[in-house]
C-alpha cells in the first residue's frame, strides 16, 4: 500500500516483475478472524439515561471479556463525563484516552470551587482555587484573605479584600447562593452564568469547547436533589490497584485516539446530531464526510461485539432542558 496506494492496476502490473509471483482470486481468501459476530443499535429517550445503560452493558460484557478487551468510544472528550461518573459509582475501573477526565479538567475544577465553597465556607482548597482565577493573588495572599474570611468580621473582610474587588464579588455571589438554596442543576446553572466571562478570559482559544463540557456537568447535576451528594459523587475516583498495568480497566477513548487499536467489544455513544456528527460538521459537506470516515474507524475497532447508542434527545442548557 505504501508503494502503490489504492491503484490496483499499478500493483498488478508491478507484480509481473517479481518472480515467482502468483495472482489469487480474492474470493478464495478466508480471514483467520471472523468479523463482528454480534451488534445492536440501542435507542434511549435521553442522553443522561445512556450512561446507566452503558454501565449495565459493560457489566454484562465483563462476564465474557476481560476489562481491557472492552472500549467505549465517543467523538469528543467531554462526551464521556456522565459515563465516568456512572462508572465510578458502579466501581468499574477505567482509563481514558483523548481528553481529560472531568475531575482533571481545569475549568471544571474552577466551577466546582464555587460549589464546594457554597457547601463549606471554610474549604481552603476551594477558596484557593477560586482566588487563583484572579491576577496577582499568590499563596501568601490567599492565606491572609482566607484568615480574614474565616474570622467572619465584615470590616476585616472588606479591608482585606480592598485590593481584590473581583474576588470579593465572587465571595458575595457564593453567599447569595447559600442564602437562597436551589436544586443542584439550578445552582450549577447560576455558577456557570457567573463564571462564563472568566472562562472566556482564562481560556480564549477554546472556551466554547470547555463551555460544552461544563454543560455536561449541569446535566449530571439534574439527576440529583441534594447538592452535597452530587459533589460527593463527582469527587469519586476510578478505583485503582497497586501495580495496575491497565489490563484491569475498561477503556474510554475518543475515536481519534482509538485509531489503529481494536477491542473484542466496542460501545459507541452519543450517535446523534451535534455530538456525532459534530455541530460544525453539519455545516460543510467535506466536514460531514470526515465524520463518516470517523464513524467507519469507530465501528471497525470491534472484533466481536458492537453496540451503538442513539439518544432521542440531548440536554441543552440554552433551551433549559432537552431538545
Indicate where each model-derived feature is located:
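Conserved helicase C-terminal RecA-like lobe
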Residues: 66, 80-89, 105, 112-323
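Structured loop/turn residues at secondary-structure junctions
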Residues: 46, 75, 99-100, 222, ...
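Conserved RecA-like helicase motor-core motifs
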Residues: 91-101
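Helicase P-loop NTPase motor core
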Residues: 1-93, 118-120
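Residue-level "edge-of-site" marker
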Residues: 14, 100, 311-312
